[in-house]
Amino acid sequence: MTTYLNNPDAVRALVQPDRVHRDLYINQEIFQLEQTHFFVNTWNYAGHESQIPDAGDWISNDIGGRPLLVVRQADGSIKAMMNRCAQKGSRLVSAPSGNTDKHFRCPYYAWTFKTDGSLLAIPLRNAYENTRLNECESGRGLTGLTHLRTYRGFIFFKINDAWYSPNFVDTFHRAV
């Protein structure tokens, strides 16, 4: 059995001028390589603005093995963040879409976040005294995505800064 992790020559050999090896479709290592290197570094489709017309409307997807939450804000803007609690990483929502009046609440420890991902409330907050909560990532709220663009109603995002194209429209205007 061929090992593809850390073996770029073996991966390149999967594509021939007249055929593609079946491992590209069924091999777990190839799948992991795609998740790790491709989906997190390129623009991905998250949904359409028509799916979240009202404030508090949200859609969730898993892209590149990461849970994503896209939310319409009260001012009409759209924010995207990771769909996982900042404390323990559990999913905040499990349905593919819905509406929240004002916040998202973790189903396990009830940490509560505003629709923009900022931390709203922590039960028994005094239990976190002397833990430097405000200095750590959890204390800042949900992990937001800085690379979010809409084009003709289509919502796209990118997780990493690698391969970042500052001119998003030039990248996609012919395809969309």
PLM feature spans:
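Rieske [2Fe-2S] iron-sulfur-binding subdomain
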Residues: 1-77, 112-176
